[in-house]
Amino acid sequence: KAGQMILTTGPYLEVETSDGILAGGLARANHSIDLRVRVQCPSWIEIDRIQVLVNGRPSEALNYTRETHPSWFGDGVVKFERSLSVELEEDAHLIVVAYGSESDLRLGYGSSDQSSNRPCAYNNPIFVDLNGDGFTPNGDTLGFALPSGRISVKEAKELLSEAGVETSE
């Protein structure tokens, strides 16, 4: 109920603010907030990217790869452990993504359908209130027209198809 969740295909992701606010929580900040990020993986899973999404959007300044920041990534169980500073101009929700763009899950998943998936984990948002008046969403729909009212599964699939998102039948 508190929204303190991660979604993962294997990597174990921990994200919290320097004040200990976890996913689903509300943090207060001035113009920046520090996120403590830790990713652990078994030996057969590799990650090579940490991306912070601000209000659902990626930023090149918050994209950390093994190639651009090699000393930030480990080869043992702990693949990444770092405090990341995020500069903000407005209230925001923050999601951290850990991803293995050069890896798959074949070693652990064998020949199952899931074996070709990439290692990926992300947290539920941490909401950040900058001015102390409560969190205000910015209203960005990320380019998707959001329907109002109830729609059927068929209508939802049609909307996703129009947006270029592939759906299963």
Label each region the model flagged.
Residues 1-169:
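C-terminal functional module detector
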